[in-house]
Amino acid sequence: MKQPGEELQETLTELDDRAVVDYLIKNPEFFIRNARAVEAIRVPHPVRGTVSLVEWHMARARNHIHVLEENMALLMEQAIANEGLFYRLLYLQRSLTAASSLDDMLMRFHRWARDLGLAGASLRLFPDRWRLGAPSNHTHLALSRQSFEPLRIQRLGQEQHYLGPLNGPELLVVLPEAKAVGSVAMSMLGSDADLGVVLFTSRDASHYQQGQGTQLLHEIALMLPELLERWIERV
């Protein structure tokens, strides 16, 4: 417990500091009138013991400039990355729009993923949202929502995207014909995330990991349903 004298001393120190700051703000010419005294003021330094007020101010300025440079470099990196994402997405959209059939579109989508160094790209659709039954030949795209639900709960939870590995039974649900899948990027299709699933696969188990960016994946998951409606009717 602090003694009354200690509390009074802290109050006086706080008042003195405030009074000094207020005085300097109101009287900026103080530094001109007392330039020599200002040069003699020493400020505590963790390494050098003390430094002059001028050196201390210059060091703060250098640190501030360094932080600004780092922030600018980060903004430039983000701008370059966003530009790259934009052109990749634009190229994919143009390619898929030019498709002459659903099979052609799926092949173009798969080829686009291969050009990025991936094993491939796949689509699975929920049959309660798309007309996939006879007489159409799109039944291979159907994904039972009931079969997918345990995987969704385990891997996605409340999220729309999942990046990482899938075990054998999980792969049989979403990619029954896939081989040597190390990791996947999986996203729920549509703005309401209820139309199906888009999957990108890699043979590298560490290629897709939680915490990686999902902006491109998100944009593709929003773009695909409208393109699919050219070939498949919505329920």
From Swiss-Prot:
Transmembrane segments: none annotated. InterPro entries: DUF484, GAF-like_dom_sf. PANTHER family: DUF484 DOMAIN-CONTAINING PROTEIN. NCBIfam families: PRK10963.1 (NF008203). This is Uncharacterized protein YigA.
